[in-house]
Amino acid sequence: RCAHGTYYSNDSQQCLLNCCWWGGGDHCCR
């Protein structure tokens, strides 16, 4: 599982910061 505020990216095979964490908006959330 990825940490809070991150999501798993299949492309890069790792957890990345979720842009919602930075106020990016729902389209970024997983």
Swiss-Prot record:
What does the UniProt keyword field contain? Answer: Disulfide bond, Neurotoxin, Secreted, Toxin
- Which tissues is this protein detected in according to the database? Expressed by the venom duct.
PTM summary from the entry reads: Contains 3 disulfide bonds.
For this record, the Gene Ontology CC terms, alphabetical, are: extracellular region
Coiled coil regions in record: none
Q: Does the keyword Ribonucleoprotein apply?
A: no
Q: Which GO terms describe its molecular function?
A: toxin activity
The answer, when asked if Oxidoreductase is one of the entry's keywords, is no
UniProt subcellular location: Secreted
Record comment regarding domains: The cysteine framework is XVIII (C-C-CC-CC).
What is this protein's name?
Conotoxin Bt12.1
User: Which species does the entry assign this protein to?
Assistant: Conus betulinus
